[in-house]
Swiss-Prot record:
Source species: Pasteurella multocida (strain Pm70)
Top-rank lineage group of the source organism: Bacteria
Pfam families to which the protein is assigned, alphabetical: Imm42 (PF15593)
Name listed for the protein in its UniProt record: Uncharacterized protein PM0502
Lineage, top ranks: Bacteria, Pseudomonadati, Pseudomonadota, Gammaproteobacteria, Pasteurellales
């Protein structure tokens, strides 16, 4: 099943394939559909209830606790780089330039953007960060060496995630 508004460049595809009776795990395909492309890819078997619960935890995040970096003024690459550095102290290609934890807290008193990808998904190379500008929501994502930025109607990502079924 595909969740979301077809007038927006983001939908979520969930195909429940295997439900193990007497166990709490539900397996199946999970993809984000961004501008008509499936991420991370078709025919991947995921633990759906873990993914959906993780995504729904995003709904409880306080947007004001994060630095949105005037996202409408910056490129996808800049926003992604800042989001990564604010979390781990260096950018992936430059581990030798690691910032100390003390310095990191001075430079980035708040994490940049809200990370909405979980370890199972990032293991495929897909990373997602949410930003909010004055009138739009922004999704910055990285996949296979490319960083992209899409604009969505304000509140759309929250509405989309809230619409996912409890599995």
């Amino acid at each position: 099943m595909i969740y979301g508004d077809y007038n927006q460049p983001l939908q979520i595809h969930i195909d429940k394939m295997i439900s193990v009776p007497d166990e709490k795990w539900v397996y199946g395909a999970f993809n984000l559909i961004i501008d008509g492309c499936f991420y991370p890819g078709k025919e991947i078997n995921w633990t759906l209830n873990i993914i959906i619960n993780w995504l729904k935890s995003f709904l409880d995040e306080d947007i004001n606790a994060y630095d949105m970096k005037n996202c409408e003024e910056h490129s996808a690459e800049y926003l992604f780089r800042e989001a990564v550095i604010s979390r781990i102290g260096y950018y992936y290609d430059e581990p030798e330039e690691k910032i100390s934890l003390e310095e990191l807290k001075k430079i980035y008193p708040k994490k940049v953007g809200i990370e909405i990808s979980l370890p199972e998904i990032t293991d495929t190379g897909l990373e997602l960060f949410f930003f909010r500008e004055k009138e739009k929501d922004i999704l910055v994502f990285y996949f296979q060496g490319t960083v992209s930025k899409i604009e969505l109607d304000m509140g759309y990502i929250h509405k989309l995630i809230a619409s996912l079924p409890d599995i």
